[in-house]
Amino acid sequence: MSTGFFGDIQKVRYEGPESDNPLAFRHYNADEIVLGKRMEDHLRFAVAYWHSFAWEGGDPFGGRTFDRPWFSNEIDAAKLKADVAFEFFSLLGAPYYCFHDADVRPEGRNFAENTRYLNEIVDIFEKKQAETGMKLLWGTANLFSNRRYMAGAATNPDPDVFAFAAATVKTCIDATKRLGGENYVLWGGREGYETLLNTDLSRELDHMGRFLSLVVEYKHKIGFKGTILIEPKPQAPTKHQYDYDVATVYGFLKRYGLENEVKVNIEQGHAILAGHSFEHELALARTLGIFGSIDMNRNDYQSGWDTDQFPNNVPEMALAYYQVLLAGGFTTGGTNFDAKLRRQSLDPQDLLIGHIGGMDCCARGLKASARMLEDGALSKPLDERYAGWNGEFGKRLLSGLSLDQIAGEVEAKDINPQPKSGRQEYLENIVNRYV
């Protein structure tokens, strides 16, 4: 039954590239076959509960701009929010959603009340998933908004905060498992520091390693089959965050022996904040064997902070999904829209329009990347660039020859290499032809 929040808006349909209907897909066709698989199964879109239904439209200089009937800290308001959210999921047609515990339940007086509220909402979600066919891509715990976490959760100097956070994660993993979630995410928004003057760096890293080990142990104990994911971010809200980027996370996982247990959920905007391109982080995660899932959004390149806008840059999406396809595609992961409306976008239909545009943009990027992959448009020039390493001398350099033997061969054969063009402009033009 309709909540009435979205008025008489009908389910979003695919109408093709010529459509001028703002509430229709022009490029995202769930059943279209791309590289032998349905587009929906490639992209595995998810709606973020927090930005879509919990964010109030505030910024550092002003408070709430959105007027939503569920904006109160009451269980009945949380139930109304769930009704509206699942109505939205059904209208949009994305197959997945994601949530933090604090997005879906009221804030209780203590841990027990938080848990009771969460379980009450999970009861509702179970029924709604059965009714709608919606699935949970991942669940997580909000370990950054409440003032108890101002100095971190896993890295807090107070062991009571560590314990409260660990207990909260336990309940959220339970909820995720119960709802059939395919992943569990940890984002350490407060796991970092404002100043080293009051920070024991060694201790905090060890505590963070212990916390993550507890999560992995509990996953196996209860038989949760999903993937544990860390979401890197360099800063904000902390000055420096410990899971800075993919490379940093990999080093952390290696140090604590968790590199085979945990993968990464990579956000476009966080990659930009870390001084990387999105495809760099995806390519590195793929290379290191820890690619898991993505949070899709974009940052304003001039602002210098995390603006969480919906994606609208097709060439960027093509390069991103090219890396996803090279990784073999998603397994348990997917494309979660960690994106929010602008604070002036007040109408309920704006929420649909933002997601529609983002889904169309990703679909165009996927199709372009699939064509590039099929045609060998980028792989053939890459193979040519490194072809020398497939020869006899290249193979001996990598296995067998010592440093003095290499020096001897260079002198004996009068090896005097000349540089070759990297052909960057040619390759960039190829990408532009496909998008």
UniProtKB/Swiss-Prot annotation:
GO function term, MF aspect, one: magnesium ion binding
GO cellular component: cytoplasm
Family in the record: Belongs to the xylose isomerase family.
Top-level taxonomic group: Bacteria
Cofactor: binding comment: Binds 2 magnesium ions per subunit.
Protein's GO biological process: D-xylose metabolic process
EC nos: 5.3.1.5
Binding site for Mg(2+) 1: 231, 267, 295, 338
Binding of Mg(2+) 2, residues: 267, 270, 306, 308
Main location: cytoplasm
Keyword Magnesium: yes
Keywords, alphabetical: Carbohydrate metabolism, Cytoplasm, Isomerase, Magnesium, Metal-binding, Xylose metabolism
Disulfide bonds: none
Localization, UniProt: Cytoplasm
Subunit structure: Homotetramer.
Active site per the UniProt annotation: 100, 103
Annotated transmembrane regions: none
Protein name: Xylose isomerase
Cofactor(s) demanded: Mg(2+)
